[in-house]
Amino acid sequence: KFCEKPSGTWSGVCGNSGACKDQCIRLEGAKHGSCNYKPPAHRCICYYEC
């Protein structure tokens, strides 16, 4: 099971899930990452093991 947390290093709207994933894994130690719609915009969300 994964817990999601907004990226602490991504700024602005997320338009590239691949780049978001790479940044979550490389810079934040996450297992995965993707762009998710969190009103009011798409954000880079990192996923960690709970």
Curated annotation (Swiss-Prot):
Presence of the UniProt keyword Disulfide bond in the record: yes
SUPFAM superfamilies: Scorpion toxin-like
Keyword annotations of the record: Antibiotic, Antimicrobial, Disulfide bond, Fungicide, Plant defense, Secreted
Source organism, top-level taxon: Eukaryota
GO BP, sorted A to Z: defense response to fungus; defense response to Gram-negative bacterium; defense response to Gram-positive bacterium; killing of cells of another organism
Subcellular location, record wording: Secreted
Gene3D superfamilies for the chain: Knottin, scorpion toxin-like
Disulfide bonds, paired cysteine numbers: 3-50, 14-35, 20-44, 24-46
PTMs per UniProt: Contains 4 disulfide bonds.
GO cellular component, one term: extracellular region
Pfam families registered for this protein in UniProt: Gamma-thionin
Predominant cellular place of this UniProt entry's protein: secreted
Recorded family membership: Belongs to the DEFL family.
Function as written in the Swiss-Prot or TrEMBL entry: Antimicrobial peptide active against fungi, Gram-positive and Gram-negative bacteria. Inhibits growth of hyphae in the fungi A.niger (IC(50)=3.5 ug/ml), B.sorokiniana (IC(50)=3.0 ug/ml), F.oxysporum (IC(50)=9.5 ug/ml), F.graminearum (IC(50)=6.9 ug/ml), F.culmorum (IC(50)=6.9 ug/ml) and B.cinerea (IC(50)=27.4 ug/ml). Has no effect on spore germination. Destroys spores in germinated conidia by disruption of cell walls and membranes in A.niger and B.sorokiniana. Causes vacuolization of germinated macro- and microconidia in F.oxysporum, F.graminearum and F.culmorum.
Name of this protein: Defensin D1
Species per Swiss-Prot/TrEMBL record: Nigella sativa (Black cumin)
